[in-house]
């Protein structure tokens, strides 16, 4: 939470506008509905939403976009009720891939690299058991792996915790191909998955792993700034269409 607040505080917006950092659950007074209420109380009529999630395959993005009225129905059943909302919503994209994200990942694992020609970076993501969402996870993480490889100059592959593919992929690169495996967790913050689940899946294998998540990283502010500019352009394009 603090890391996201710090990244947002560094934004230098071209236009003055109020900003709310909201969370899906557990943070009292800072839930999504709280943020909407505070913005609309200021007279806001258009809200730019930046979903701070690693992948388009997250079911949370699906349910949040539905609850914000961006889509008529969720792709997966949800308990999340539609929010009280009068403003028009412009919904951005999660991290997924792209050079900023690749550089964040590379910066986190760069200290573990000793001999790039003999190494492979293995991106490890959460994944999904749900059809449709798994395909989005695969599409995003495979694209990110290619970009990380371009940025780092090190062979980069990927695996998901769900369905389990981490152990076999790491074993393949280490035992069959003779590469040193550097594991990069695709998680925004430290927690159960980075400290417990990933090491458990890799038990018995040789690998390098710091457990460092993607955040904090200064490039998150750059990524958010780009999202805001793109959403503002969409908003202005829509306004011109409405006025014609």
Q: What is the predicted function of each stretch?
A:
Residues 1-244:
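Extended amphipathic ligand-handling, pore-lining, and cofactor/metal-binding catalytic surfaces
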């Amino acid at each position: 939470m603090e890391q996201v607040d710090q990244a947002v505080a560094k934004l230098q917006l071209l236009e003055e506008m109020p900003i709310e950092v909201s969370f899906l659950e557990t943070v009292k007074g800072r839930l999504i509905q709280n943020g909407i209420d505070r913005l609309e109380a200021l007279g806001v009529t258009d809200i730019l939403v930046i979903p701070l999630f690693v992948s388009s395959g997250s079911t949370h993005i699906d349910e949040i976009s539905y609850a914000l009225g961006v889509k008529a129905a969720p792709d997966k059943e949800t308990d999340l009720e539609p929010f009280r909302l009068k403003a028009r919503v412009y919904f951005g994209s999660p991290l997924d891939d792209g050079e900023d994200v690749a550089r964040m990942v590379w910066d986190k694992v760069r200290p573990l690299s000793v001999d790039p020609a003999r190494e492979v970076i293995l991106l490890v993501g959460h994944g999904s058991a749900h059809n449709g969402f798994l395909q989005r996870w695969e599409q995003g993480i495979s694209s990110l792996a290619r970009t990380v490889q371009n940025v780092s100059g090190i062979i980069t592959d990927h695996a998901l915790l769900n369905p389990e593919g981490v152990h076999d992929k790491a074993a393949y690169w280490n035992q069959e191909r003779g590469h040193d495996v550097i594991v990069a967790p695709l998680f925004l913050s430290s927690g159960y998955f980075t400290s417990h689940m990933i090491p458990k899946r890799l038990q018995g294998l040789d690998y390098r792993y710091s457990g460092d998540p993607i955040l904090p990283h200064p490039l998150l502010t750059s990524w958010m700034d780009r999202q805001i500019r793109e959403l503002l352009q969409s908003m202005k394009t829509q306004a011109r269409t409405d006025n014609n």
